[in-house]
């Protein structure tokens, strides 16, 4: 296929640049048509930047990947979808907001666009989605991270070691908006934000972000585990997240939100 895939990005940080690097190495030609940032003059990196969603959409992207946080997804996603452009959100946790999710689905349906949910830092998302058709009774996500991966992104004290949080996926994405977007993907693939249980643990000896997914139901049960190295010390995201965003942008390996 010789026609370049035109990709727009919301954000221009570490995750966005890592994903763009993966896209640049694909056999299919890919053109990054621009990044949407608050202040194009302060943007770092070599990617072209725009200061408004109108300017980004004027570049005629085939797909837009959001890499800028839950607030950015809430601000720009509806306009992107209403323009008939597919959206790949990194900040899937924002979709715990039922009103926002409903508005985005309505905009996508009206314009013939899709919301492509990436697998993120976890394996087994496709299996969980398949198991849902048979019957899923319980889903648990357990994340174990070094203190630096959590402490700078939340307000309030956290323990030095051990259990930092236990609750629903809906509660988790509110408590850790930059760290547990993966739980949003798991909730959407499985049994929802209120029934999906989340445990967050801190381990000062950890050298990677460890993600575990446990599910049980009429299909049987499974336990998936990923030990993901972070993109950099300045980013809470695992390296595989950038790969999953690139894969979803290219048109495979994603959950179509409906």
UniProtKB/Swiss-Prot annotation:
The active site is at residue 211. Pfam families: Asp_DH_C (PF01958), NAD_binding_3 (PF03447). Its EC number is 1.4.1.21. SUPFAM superfamilies: Glyceraldehyde-3-phosphate dehydrogenase-like, C-terminal domain (SSF55347), NAD(P)-binding Rossmann-fold domains (SSF51735). It catalyses: L-aspartate + NADP(+) + H2O = oxaloacetate + NH4(+) + NADPH + H(+); L-aspartate + NAD(+) + H2O = oxaloacetate + NH4(+) + NADH + H(+). Pathway: Cofactor biosynthesis; NAD(+) biosynthesis; iminoaspartate from L-aspartate (dehydrogenase route): step 1/1. NAD(+) binds at residues 121, 181. GO terms for molecular function: aspartate dehydrogenase activity; NAD binding; NADP binding; oxidoreductase activity, acting on the CH-NH2 group of donors, NAD or NADP as acceptor. The keyword Oxidoreductase applies. The iminoaspartate product is unstable in aqueous solution and can decompose to oxaloacetate and ammonia. This is L-aspartate dehydrogenase 1.
């Amino acid at each position: 296929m010789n026609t370049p895939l035109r990709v727009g990005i919301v954000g221009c940080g570490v995750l966005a640049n890592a994903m763009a690097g993966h896209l640049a190495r694909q056999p299919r030609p890919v053109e990054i048509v621009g990044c949407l940032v608050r202040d194009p003059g302060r943007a770092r990196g070599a990617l072209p930047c725009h200061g408004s969603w109108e300017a980004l959409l004027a570049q005629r992207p085939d797909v837009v990947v959001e890499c800028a946080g839950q607030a950015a997804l809430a601000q720009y996603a509806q306009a992107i979808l209403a323009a008939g452009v597919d959206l790949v959100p990194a900040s899937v946790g924002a979709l715990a907001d039922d009103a926002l999710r409903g508005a985005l689905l309505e905009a996508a349906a009206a314009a013939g666009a899709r919301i492509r949910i990436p697998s993120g830092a976890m394996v087994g998302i496709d299996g969980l989605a398949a198991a849902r058709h048979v019957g899923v009774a319980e889903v648990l996500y357990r994340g174990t991270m070094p203190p630096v991966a959590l402490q700078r992104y939340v307000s309030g004290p956290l323990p030095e070691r051990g259990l930092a949080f236990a609750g629903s996926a809906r509660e988790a994405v509110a408590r850790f908006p930059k760290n547990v977007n993966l739980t949003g993907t798991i909730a959407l693939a499985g049994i929802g934000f209120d029934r999906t249980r989340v445990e967050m643990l801190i381990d000062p000896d950890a050298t990677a972000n460890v993600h575990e997914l446990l599910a049980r139901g009429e299909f049987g049960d499974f336990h998936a585990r990923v030990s993901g190295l972070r993109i950099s010390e300045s980013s809470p995201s695992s390296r595989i997240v950038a790969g999953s965003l690139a894969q979803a942008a290219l048109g495979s390996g994603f959950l179509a939100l409906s």
